[in-house]
Amino acid sequence: MTELIELKEIEERVILVAVSTGDEEDAKGSLDELEELVKTAGAVAVDKVIQNRERIHPGTYLGKGKIEEIKDRIWELDATGIVCDDELSPAQLRNLEGALDTKVMDRTMVILDIFASRAVTREGKIQVELAQLRYRSARLVGLRSSLSRLGGGIGTRGPGEKKLEMDRRLIHDRIGMLKAELEDVKRHREVVRQQRDKNHVPAAAIVGYTNAGKSTLLNRLTDAGILAEDKLFATLDPTTRNLSLPGGQQILLTDTVGFIRKLPHHLIEAFKSTLEEAKYSDIILHVVDCSNPQMDMQMYVVYETLRELGICDKIMITVFNKIDAADAGVILRDVSSDHQVRISAKTGEGLDELINLLETILRNQKVYLERIYSYKEAGKIQLIRKYGQLLKEEYQEDGIFVNAYVPSELFASLADNADAFNE
């Protein structure tokens, strides 16, 4: 039976917990990031605990001694729960909660909670609920026990700010319904994409680590008016806007959801239809926060996620953002990209270079056209203006002299006996 439980807002005080099996500095950096995630989700981190172990304990995540230590810290700090920096198995969740007698959450629950509060579009809400149900279906017993302790907080947000408790059969049925709805959305996206291709409008996807400044960049370039907050996952639903380049060429720019380390696989699966905007784009703009001391790690995470999505064959521009806040001696280099620019989306520095680079790349993907059109063929010049880059238009006695760059698929219909060649 489906049971709806109304939630009340609470202030959660949580202890962040991680297991380091190698580089402790990396574990500290990951916990710092988890602290930002927890803050974004509306809770406060009152302590951070790292246990150095050869491997994560398969039954309880932590060792017995560390569990006792954390139990004391929970009492001392009046904490309402703990958040583990890795995704817990159903057994780990259940056993750890039993040992600590408190609410236990993991990194995935926090990320899903943020996504649930940020989803605006129908597609975004479907994708978040699908990811939540896939995660919860294997953890029903542990989650019911844990979430019922406080009646709300991290891990309980969802459609309508209510917690939906289901048995496995109902969850399975609901997942099937959501997948069908997502297929409908995907088909609609495909129709829109085909129309875009028919109109010969190139597209660029803006990707990057969360909080790298993707939305700020899109706002700067297109005056899109997107909420650009200094928060993790400020953008969840993709936004597409048109950018007119100096030579008249149009390009569609799409802001996508940010990537993050330890991004749950079922989240990537759920958001595949959204991330396909990157897969079917002509250019990838990889925005990098070059003021972040963990810049190299963040770049690695983005490339690994793109590889998992099968997006490795696109023209890549690495956009080193926030140069106004970066250390003077920082080395900015990305051997995996085709082009690199340094900008500040906040101040506007370097944006002209980025725009010119986009124009150059698109021009090099076109065919050069030079010919004289009769005055009866003026409609073809309108096509060039709309889909290409008109370099020169000169009215002569015998017709209109034109040279331009045009999409290769339009060249045959525009050229006739024209003098043309690939640049």
From Swiss-Prot:
GO MF term (any one): GTPase activity
Keyword Ligase: no
One cellular-component annotation, GO: cytoplasm
Binding-site residues, GTP: 208-215, 233-237, 255-258, 321-324, 344-346
SUPFAM superfamilies: P-loop containing nucleoside triphosphate hydrolases
Subcellular location per the Swiss-Prot or TrEMBL entry: Cytoplasm
This protein's UniProt keywords: Cytoplasm, GTP-binding, Magnesium, Metal-binding, Nucleotide-binding
Gene3D superfamilies cross-referenced by the UniProt entry: 6.10.250.2860, GTPase HflX, N-terminal domain, P-loop containing nucleotide triphosphate hydrolases
Domain Hflx-type G: 202-366
Cofactor(s) the record lists: Mg(2+)
Record-listed Mg(2+) binding positions: S215, T235
Quaternary state and interactors: Monomer. Associates with the 50S ribosomal subunit.
NCBIfam families: GTP_HflX (TIGR03156)
Family under the similarity heading: Belongs to the TRAFAC class OBG-HflX-like GTPase superfamily. HflX GTPase family.
Summary of the function given for this chain in its UniProt record: GTPase that associates with the 50S ribosomal subunit and may have a role during protein synthesis or ribosome biogenesis.
Listed name of the protein: GTPase HflX
Gene transcribed to yield this protein: hflX
